[in-house]
Regions:
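Short, surface-exposed ligand-recognition loops at beta-strand->loop->(often short) alpha-helix junctions
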Residues: 35-43
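Internal catalytic-core helix/loop-beta-alpha segment
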Residues: 94-121
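Single conserved hydrophobic/aromatic residue that forms the stacking wall/gate
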Residues: 183-194
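Hydrophobic/aromatic-rich, well-ordered segments within soluble, folded domains that form packed cores
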Residues: 120-147
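Short, flexible, solvent-exposed loop/turn segments with mixed acidic/basic and small polar residues
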Residues: 18-24, 59-63, 110-115
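Short, extreme N-terminal leader segments that mark the start of a protein/domain
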Residues: 1-33
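A glycine-rich, hydrophobic loop/mini-helix early in the fold
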Residues: 44-101
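Short terminal or interdomain "cap/linker" segment that borders an active site or interface and mediates
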Residues: 145-183
Length: 194
């Protein structure tokens, strides 16, 4: 049995790092999660998935070692829509993606994360980053951007700044509510107007 303090810790981390995804504002979020042992981590991951899957949110690891895992928290329905866009498929094709279904694309992303020394930049397409910004990030090698927030912005700065503010506000609200013990991952999702 996993200690409830540990489950509270993973829940708080998911809320802290992934509130925009939990609220339905983004397709996915990514964060590094540290744990003490792999057995407890597997139980924590299973517990969080049991609570979130009913709400249409899933958690998987893209890479892990003995003490930490790179977790991807995502909404498969939104990811499916994102992956169906021709512009997204064109970018993914250049990185060896051939099947644009959710499961196959995540599997290929895991392979790319695991085998590359440098982070696969197409990951932004799995995180609701605008495709134009992902393309320019790759072309510009991360330089010459207009502004930087959740991602480096090359195109629509006003839109991106607005989204960054919404994501920050969402995270603040979700953390405040969680810290007041008014909501936990296992409770029904409440839409927060941001």
């Amino acid at each position: 049995m996993v200690c409830t303090d540990v489950l509270g810790r993973i829940e708080r981390e998911v809320i802290k790092e992934c509130s925009p995804t939990l609220a339905g504002l983004k397709t996915g979020n990514l964060f590094n999660y540290r744990y003490d042992n792999i057995s407890d981590f597997r139980k924590e991951l299973a517990s969080v998935n049991r609570k979130l899957n009913a709400k249409g949110v899933y958690v998987t690891f893209l890479k892990r070692n003995e003490k930490s895992a790179l977790l991807y928290v995502f909404r498969p329905d939104r990811l499916e829509k994102d992956l169906s866009q021709p512009a997204v498929q064109n970018v993914l094709k250049t990185f060896g993606y051939t099947d644009y279904k959710v499961g196959a694309s995540i599997k290929h992303l895991k392979q790319r994360v695991g085998e590359n020394t440098c982070f696969p930049h197409e990951i932004g397409l799995f995180l609701s980053y605008p495709v134009e910004d992902v393309i320019q990030f790759i072309r510009q090698k991360g330089c010459n951007y207009k502004c930087c927030g959740v991602w480096k912005v090359y195109c629509d700065e006003a839109f991106s700044q607005k989204m960054f503010a919404r994501y920050r506000k969402c995270t603040e609200v979700y953390l405040r509510v969680f810290d007041l013990s008014l909501i936990h991952i296992s409770e029904p999702t409440r839409r927060v107007v941001i």
